[in-house]
């Protein structure tokens, strides 16, 4: 008996969906940003035991990049008020990783206007670092380009992470990406700093980014915040839209509402190179005690409010630190600022 054409089509569509669910892109790169974004929560005071365990866990879990922290200026920031991962000296990284004879690559972030990159970032041949992530706003792109070219000339992989992208105008974004496309930068990063984006708005932005990235042969990355409980959903959306570099953190640790959690993301990617068990073990042995010690991050109403209004979470962070619970008053305050 011949199967009706409509049934054949439905069966083919079902099989395509099953294949999509079971398939994975080999170009995906998973970036652990726990120390860097999580360091904003505890001023980068992680013990060496914690950092070594995180490094070993990333290796076992198949994570592609581990971001150690910032390359912040010691002239601008008091070294006595921050842990070592605010500054990421090469010797401190080597004390953790040795020669790093593994597949795990190492990254640091350098903020425009907050680092002495010409002196503090050594040539790649002298450093354990593989990737320099240049953080900028859309209005500081010329300074970012100078940093990008400096890092490329020193032999590094380089990304450009344009922060607070949800507040930028499309014409400004296009101009910035066209300027960046003509540099040696390897990756354009979409950064939802305020956790204000939804999957559909992110999809439109990725399409826009990808048009220019493809023109210049660049890769795309995503860094999501969890103010509206959408960091994981937005990262998954980005994967489906062709983004390759995915930032995530253990237990979602990060400034304010935190970031995309690495645990469900590993499961979502369907790639046999990734192993979620070491991540679960690290969470049990290190992240849960860190929470119990009083270090706070994660979704709460105050972060939802700033995300809804596309505002920087600094007011919500202050609300949390002050131990306030008057959410309705806080809502009135942030609406008045909008």
Feature map (PLM): residue ranges:
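Methionine residue identity
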Residues: 1-3
């Amino acid at each position: 008996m011949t199967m009706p054409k409509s049934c054949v089509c439905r069966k083919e569509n079902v099989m395509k969906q099953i294949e999509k669910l079971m398939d994975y892109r080999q170009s995906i790169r998973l970036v652990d940003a726990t120390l860097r974004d999580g360091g904003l929560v505890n001023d980068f005071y992680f013990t060496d035991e914690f950092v070594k365990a995180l490094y070993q866990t990333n290796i076992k879990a198949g994570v592609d990049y581990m971001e150690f922290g910032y390359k912040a200026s010691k002239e601008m920031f008091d070294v006595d008020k921050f842990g070592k991962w605010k500054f990421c000296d090469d010797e401190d990284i080597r004390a953790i990783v040795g020669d790093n004879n593994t597949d795990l690559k190492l990254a640091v972030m350098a903020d425009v206007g907050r680092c002495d990159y010409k002196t503090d970032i050594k040539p790649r041949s002298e450093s354990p670092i593989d990737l320099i992530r240049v953080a900028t706003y859309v209005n500081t792109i010329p300074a970012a380009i100078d940093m990008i070219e400096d890092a490329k000339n020193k032999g590094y992989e380089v990304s450009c992470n344009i922060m607070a992208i949800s507040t930028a105008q499309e014409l400004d974004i296009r101009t910035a990406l066209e300027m960046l496309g003509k540099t040696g930068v390897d990756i354009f990063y979409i950064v939802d700093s305020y956790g204000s984006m939804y999957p559909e708005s992110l999809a439109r932005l990725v399409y826009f980014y990808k048009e220019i990235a493809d023109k210049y042969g660049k890769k795309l990355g995503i860094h999501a915040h969890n103010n509206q409980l959408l960091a994981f959903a937005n990262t998954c959306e980005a994967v489906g839209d062709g983004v390759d570099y995915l930032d995530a953190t253990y237990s979602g640790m990060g400034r304010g509402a935190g970031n995309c959690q690495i645990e469900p993301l590993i499961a979502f990617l369907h790639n046999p190179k990734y192993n979620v068990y070491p991540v679960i073990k690290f969470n049990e042995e290190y992240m849960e005690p860190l929470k119990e010690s009083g270090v706070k991050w994660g979704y709460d109403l105050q972060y939802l409010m700033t995300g809804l209004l596309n505002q920087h979470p600094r007011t919500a962070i202050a609300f949390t630190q002050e131990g306030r619970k008057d959410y309705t008053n806080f809502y009135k305050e942030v609406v008045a600022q909008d």
